[in-house]
């Protein structure tokens, strides 16, 4: 008994991913998914998501100081969680709703690098539960950005760390020195907060090649997440070495699995599923250390870095046979991570695949056995729980394959894929019935809400945002002959507008107030990857995506220029008028006529 008790703590150490885990994860975003990945919108889909997914990986959820996918992280602690995907309250509500429906939420954790506030070396000061957290210039790696950070720090009379980066450098932002006690203190507090305050169940660590895996071990042993997966984008041996460096406190994405699927689908040669990719077996393959790293493999066939984004940013996407690729993904060991765009396009079929996977009892440690391979199709048998097995056949002629035993019974099929099962009757497998996801609809303009007001002398504008434009709207304003940076003092997309409330039609209304004494000539509003056209600025103007609708300043009365009231008078475009001529002006937030 004493021996068992002595060994117990060792067996209970933080494990990067549970053994024999049968769950499936959704990547709940894609690049520039500012509308589809809104916290409030995801929450409305929870009933459908909970039929299929056990985990949902969300984009980095902190305020990055502008419209962002979150990889230029700025703030880490509560009070700064109004992001491009929603408010802090909406995020907390989403995580809570997911939890009540049996879904765990995975946080995207970006700690390789961090954005600065105003220069090369300053970081925000944040107070959480009475403790102040702030990274210093001395927390930046000595060789950051080829020594440029050190040079810039010196110009300010500051210094950087004496420690060089423990991983690959990246010039986009400041690489953090994870040997620093202060960095470790900040990161540990941040991770504990994500788990214990927001309610995340685990982490997806971004760009883990940027710092030594020993620090992921340090952080995971301290915070003890239920799930941890790192983005180690490299060969299988490099990924294995990183997993080992973490003390197996973290799983990793199986990039070589993804590449073998891409090779097969894009080339129309399904025998490539049985081949290496540039000398690399996938982590889940029996050819890679006899499959002993399957537990730590999070498999996928597409993500935000490989997807097709546009004609000028094509990346390295699956170009065809998305369904067959997902059928293979969801039949194989490892923990599958389904890409949001694939789920959106094929909800019912992917849900059916997952239902069969779970009914058979396939886990991250199940054993696959190839049954047939040629250019037209690939067949693989995967052992589930007990005597149950799944036979997955994918390829252009998947339907032509005939199982070698009558014990196999077809359960589902589709374009270039077939699932057979044995040891379980297809009739006992319940396929989910998904609901139609509610599609947000913008309301028609029906007047200015009462909460829209203009202060005396205030230069401002209002914007009624489409529902799909996200929860943060930005304002870009400029003078003729200049640009927004000249007028606003910042780059695109400009200055964040303030959310005032919700109009009667359900659209959110934002207000922007100029910090200048002179009104701009033009204005643009943007959010969620969308923007208005260039519009003429009208002070107090109430705009929507189609342009100026009306002016918030209501009421009109006649006054004389010599009535004795010293209140300032402004032109309709917001300029102070010292000696008004006859015409219409603004005074005390009202339109007035001077005759």
Question: Where in the sequence are the language-model features?
Answer:
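Substrate-binding cleft of carbohydrate-active enzyme catalytic domains
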Residues: 86-128
């Amino acid at each position: 008994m004493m021996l068992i008790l002595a060994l117990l703590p060792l067996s209970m150490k933080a494990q990067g991913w549970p053994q024999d885990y049968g769950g499936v994860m959704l990547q709940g975003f894609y690049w520039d998914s500012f509308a589809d990945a809104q916290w409030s919108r995801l929450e409305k889909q929870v009933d459908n998501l909970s039929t299929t997914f056990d985990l949902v990986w969300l984009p980095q959820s902190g305020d990055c100081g502008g419209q962002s996918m979150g990889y230029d992280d700025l703030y880490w602690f509560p009070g700064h969680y109004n992001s491009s995907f929603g408010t802090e309250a909406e995020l907390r509500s989403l995580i809570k709703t997911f939890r009540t429906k049996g879904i765990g939420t995975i946080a995207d954790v970006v700690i390789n690098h961090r954005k600065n506030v105003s220069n090369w070396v300053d970081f925000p000061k944040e107070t959480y539960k009475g403790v102040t957290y702030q990274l210093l210039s001395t927390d930046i790696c000595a060789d950051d950005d080829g020594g440029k950070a050190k040079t810039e720090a010196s110009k300010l009379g500051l210094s950087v760390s004496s420690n060089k980066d423990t991983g690959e450098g990246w010039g986009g932002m400041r690489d953090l020195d994870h040997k620093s006690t202060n960095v470790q203190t900040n990161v540990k507090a941040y991770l504990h907060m994500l788990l214990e305050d927001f309610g995340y169940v685990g982490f997806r660590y971004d760009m883990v090649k940027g710092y030594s895996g020993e620090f992921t071990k340090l952080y995971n042993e301290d915070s003890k997440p239920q799930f941890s997966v790192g983005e180690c984008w490299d060969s299988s041996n490099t990924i294995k070495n990183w997993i080992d460096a973490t003390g197996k406190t973290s799983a990793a994405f199986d990039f070589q699995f993804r590449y073998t699927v891409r090779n097969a689908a894009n080339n129309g040669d399904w025998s490539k599923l049985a081949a290496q990719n540039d000398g690399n077996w996938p982590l889940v393959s029996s050819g890679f250390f006899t499959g002993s790293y399957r537990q730590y493999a999070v498999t996928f066939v597409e993500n935000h870095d490989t997807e097709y984004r546009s004609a000028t940013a094509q990346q390295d996407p699956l170009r065809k046979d998305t369904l067959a690729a997902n059928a293979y993904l969801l039949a194989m060991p490892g923990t599958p991570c389904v890409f949001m765009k694939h789920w959106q396009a094929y909800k019912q079929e992917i849900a059916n695949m997952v239902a069969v996977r779970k009914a058979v009892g396939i886990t991250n440690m199940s054993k696959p056995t190839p049954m047939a391979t040629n250019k037209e199709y690939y067949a693989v048998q995967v052992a589930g729980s007990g005597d149950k097995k799944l036979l997955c056949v994918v390829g252009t002629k998947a339907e032509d394959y005939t199982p070698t035993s009558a014990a196999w019974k077809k359960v589902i099929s589709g374009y270039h894929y077939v699932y057979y099962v044995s040891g379980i009757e297809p009739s006992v497998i319940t396929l989910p019935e998904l609901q139609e996801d509610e599609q947000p609809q913008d309301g028609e303009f029906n007047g200015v809400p009462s909460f829209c007001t203009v202060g005396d002398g205030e230069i401002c504008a209002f914007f009624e945002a489409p529902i799909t434009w996200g929860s943060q709207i930005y304002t870009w304003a400029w003078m003729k002959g200049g640009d927004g940076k000249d007028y606003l003092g910042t780059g695109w997309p400009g200055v964040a507008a303030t959310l005032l409330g919700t109009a009667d039609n359900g659209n959110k209304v934002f207000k922007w107030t100029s910090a200048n004494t002179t009104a701009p000539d033009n204005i643009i509003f943007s959010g969620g990857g969308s923007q208005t056209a260039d519009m003429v600025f009208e002070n107090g103007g109430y705009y929507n995506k189609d342009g100026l609708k009306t002016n918030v300043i209501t009421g009109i009365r006649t006054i004389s220029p010599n009535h004795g009231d010293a209140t300032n008078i402004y032109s309709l475009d917001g300029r102070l008028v010292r000696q008004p001529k006859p015409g219409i002006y603004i005074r005390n937030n009202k339109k007035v006529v001077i005759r």
